[in-house]
Amino acid sequence: MLVGLALSSCAPSHLPPGEGLHKSAVSHLREAEKTTLPDEQRAVRYLDAARESSALLGSAESGEASRVIYNKAAADLVVLLRSAQNGGMWNRPLTLSQGGSTYRLRFAKGTRDGLWNADQFTSFVPADEVDLKTIKRRNRIDGYGGALVSIRKTDPLEAFSPLVGVTAPVTAVLDFKGNDVTLSLIDPTERTKGRAAGKDRTLDADFSAPLAYYPQHNEMLEGLLGAIRVQQHMNITGLYMLQPYDPQRIPLIFVHGLISTPRMWRNVINEIETDPELRRRYQCWVFAYPTGNPLLYSALRLREELAKVQQRYPDSKDMVLVGHSMGGILSRAQVTTVERDSWDVIGEEKADQFFSKVKPGDLVHRCTNFTANPNVDRAIFICSPHRGSDMAIGTLGSLAIKLISLPVDLVSTAANTVGGSMSMITGDAKRMPTSIDGLSPKNPTVKVLDSCPIEVPHHSIIGDQGKGDTPESSDGVVDY
């Protein structure tokens, strides 16, 4: 019964009963939770609880209950020290005394092999306090140490940081040698073991909580508004890293499709993080953009963001792009070279007319002429309409085009450049092409991209509605 209670949760209200060998440790932990006490007194009580429980780790009689106490004490101590006294108790040697207890606490220095520098993060949240309702399968390992979501949020925000900051899984381990104690913040994606009570032990880790920490909204509504109210959502455009940059890992960049948001990828990323080899080799990024914009304009913005990554992090090589639906077309535009002559596939006379007013370097030129990114090593396309979708020219597509409101400055720039030649793309000399136009099988963009080779190894995941793995199959939107 005791083991069952210990396993149930590490939340404050689910501690093991205060009895038996660990009675004193539970008492220390409950006292440490009293926020009315001075910070130093609370820290000492967390250390008391961790020290007493660590002495029983692995014992047959009380080992599991002691593990729960030790883990919670380690996690909550980190949260306290990082937030107390405006960071005054963080990442410096501390001598802490209360009653008959005295501890000399030091922070382990960060290394490049799985030990975080304490100053890397601005706050912490215990992993068990994060709401995981949007995660289909929790990815965690039961072991030793306090599992935490670490957050790095600066003001102003650093490049490629989400609004809530960059998160990462961290496991806090306290190793006692008499009254001397070392606090280590371990990256469980790099290390599977940490030293506690004089022994290397399997780390407790939660890889799902850092993903679930990011705010969850109504995805369908947010995606729809991003498609039809483009101007109001232009500021979200960008690449975002979901963990601190690691030059040893390959950027795996996810690009969502029409009427969607980067949140669509959370369970895909969670499954990737489940595999020890994948999480060791890859770091996941997402590209966000309002999906109503012209397809080639969104592709340009992705291209510009990738260039910023390369400028800030020159070690970002061998990147892998994963695009769903229209996001696959944006991804393809990063691994394909399109030059002026490429547009002759729609007819030389039409192409000449369209480019007659286009000047090198202007917006339209940058959207329609580009080279494959040499730092992208592979592309994965998921249900991507490389040759367009008939749905874009049907009733639903026509209605969607009418609902989309594009940014005024973007419309003005394009109109002033190509003028009446816009009809070549939209059929209307006065109408700017939307993303829906870009998905039409009749659209010149689709024809041009389809005529240019993909310059990296690539893979396609193709949907099927039961017609078999044949050229006649379809997922209902995109034909084989």
Which role does the model predict for each range below?
Residues S27, E31-L37, Q41-V44, S53-V68, ...:
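Serine-dependent carboxylesterase/thioesterase catalytic core
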Residues S405, V411-Y480:
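C-terminal subdomain of alpha/beta-hydrolase-fold enzymes, centered on the catalytic histidine
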Residues R266-Y282:
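Short amphipathic alpha-helix adjacent to the substrate-entry channel of hydrolases
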Residues M1-S8:
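Bacterial N-terminal signal peptides
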Residues Q231-Q232, L242-P247, C367-R378, R431-N443:
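Alpha-helix-centered segments that form part of catalytic cores
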Residues C10-L252, T261-N267, Q283-V286:
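Flexible, membrane-associating and regulatory peripheral segments of lipid-active enzymes
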Residues M234-L239, P262, E305-R312, K357-T368, ...:
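A Trp-anchored, charged/polar loop motif used as the substrate-binding/catalytic surface
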Residues L242-Y245, T274-L278, Q310-D315, C367-N373, ...:
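Surface-exposed acidic, glycine-flexible loop patches that form ligand/cofactor-binding
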